[in-house]
Amino acid sequence: MVETKLMEEQRWGPVWFIPGQNKGRYPYCHSLYIEGAGILIDPASDRERLIQLRKEHGVNAVWLSHWHEDHLMHLDLFDDLPLWISEKDTPAISSVETFLDCYGIEYHGYRKYWRQLLEEEFHFKPRKPTKFLQGGQTIDLSTVTVEVISTPGHTPGNLAFFFREPKVLFMGDYDLAKFGPWYGDRYSSIEETIDSINLLRKIPANVFLAGHETGIFRGNPGKRWDDYLNVIFDRENRLLQFLNQPRTMEEIVEACIVYGRPREPKAFFELGERGLMKKHLERLTKAEKVFQEGNKYIKNAAIQKGKLIPNPTTTDHK
């Protein structure tokens, strides 16, 4: 049964944390609202609450941390308002077909599933941004100063927001959840994901806000950063172990290295498994730790049996 009870709203000066339904788990996320300026960030928390928020306090513009559907589910409520997003993430919201292309969805049946899902559950409508948010920008909203931070990897134009006066950092989908980072889109990057996480952990914030699940971390999350990064290396190590013998892409996907077991709907979970494994194969092939022979992948024989990839997070950041 889906848990529908909401977490409590929290406020740090003009920065309001609006919890998502089901504790911000997909397909929901936590939203932010900036009082005074009327800025709403990532409108996919709770539809009724967002309607109430606009009616009682006013919403003047919507900002998106990135283009994913679970961060714009209720954007349709604000069709008449200015929309700000990074330029690199803009193409994905320009049409349903481009959205699917950015996910790397090729199979016709999966595209049909996602097309229906986007339109019916996520109320997707093509949008053209009013302005572009750029990493390095400092925006004075009168009630608070916002530093826009470029955090690519999850998506090419992924953004975080540091609210200077209350020292609050919104990390978006770098959520420190046990599942680990997502970097399975067509234009995602493992290397950029690692760099962005290591950038965020150094921000001098008193409060770290994430787009999903726990949502609020008072003080630096500490070991949670390493645990989060380690998921990347654990996935890679398991893949390397699986490639002790030649494997096709289909065999790799069926091994369920990411999700642990076959799950439904396949159009969602098989797509995710394939996307993440593809990124790891690209990374391992580039490092010559894996070779491709025809339609099969195999671990480089020069890698000693049982020797795993060193985990840089265990020594680089304490």
PLM region spans:
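Soluble or luminal CAZymes and related metallo-dependent hydrolases
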Residues: 45, 131, 188-192, 231, ...
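Short glycine/proline-enriched coil/turn segments at helix->beta-strand junctions
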Residues: 35-38, 55-59, 76-82, 164-166, ...
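Conserved beta-strand hairpin/beta-sheet module of binuclear metal-dependent hydrolase folds
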Residues: 2-53, 160-174
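A short catalytic or substrate-binding loop motif that flags glycine-/basic-rich loops and adjacent residues
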Residues: 24-26, 133, 152-155, 318
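C-terminal regulatory/interaction regions
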Residues: 238-318
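Metallo-beta-lactamase
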Residues: 145-236
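Active-site neighborhood of phospho(di)ester-bond hydrolases with catalytic His/Asp-centered motifs
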Residues: 41-44, 59-70, 83-87, 150-153, ...
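Active-site HxH/HxHxD metal-binding segment of metal-dependent hydrolases
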Residues: 22, 27-28, 45-140
